[in-house]
Design a protein with these regions (language model features):
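Short, charge-rich binding segments
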Residues: 38, 62-71, 82-83, 91-94
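Short coil/turn segments at secondary-structure boundaries
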Residues: 44-48, 61, 65, 77-81
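Conserved ATP-dependent adenylate/AMP-binding module captured primarily in the ANL superfamily
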Residues: 1-14, 54-76, 107-109
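AMP-binding/adenylate-forming
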Residues: 50-55, 74-109
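Glycine/alanine-rich phosphate-binding loops at beta-alpha junctions
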Residues: 6-16, 20, 39, 43
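Conserved AMP-binding A3 loop
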Residues: 31-58
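Conserved pre-ATP/AMP-binding loop-to-beta segment of ANL
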Residues: 17-35, 68-73
Length: 109
């Protein structure tokens, strides 16, 4: 069995946020708070249940055609971790015990 691991580039500045989410996950928190992007109105906080996050992680895993026999994956997170895309990369790494390496997002799409 492999274990989750997070690593960070020297210019990544959201390590405190990542560590907070890791702690929540590892202590079996059932609710997680994320801010919406604010693309259609003012950003707001939303609550996401652990079960919903696991469901999403499992569906993404299946959609990408990953095999359960793979005992370790490493992923690079270059998305803002406080937004949905980067946050879900972190959740998938936690759920599947992957190694995730964070670098700062350098562009805003």
């Amino acid at each position: 069995m492999t274990h989750f691991k997070a690593s960070y580039s020297e210019h990544f500045h959201d390590q405190d946020y990542v560590e907070k989410v890791i702690h929540q996950w590892q202590t079996d928190s059932q609710l997680f708070v994320l801010s919406t992007s604010g693309s259609t109105e003012k950003p707001k906080k939303i609550q996401l249940s652990r079960n919903m996050l696991i469901w999403s992680a499992e569906k993404t895993y299946a959609a990408l055609g990953l095999q359960k026999k793979q005992n370790q994956l490493s992923v690079l997170c270059c998305l803002p971790v406080q937004k949905t895309g980067g946050f879900m990369q972190l959740i998938r790494a936690l759920h599947f015990n992957w190694h995730i390496h964070f670098i700062p997002a350098t562009a805003n799409p």
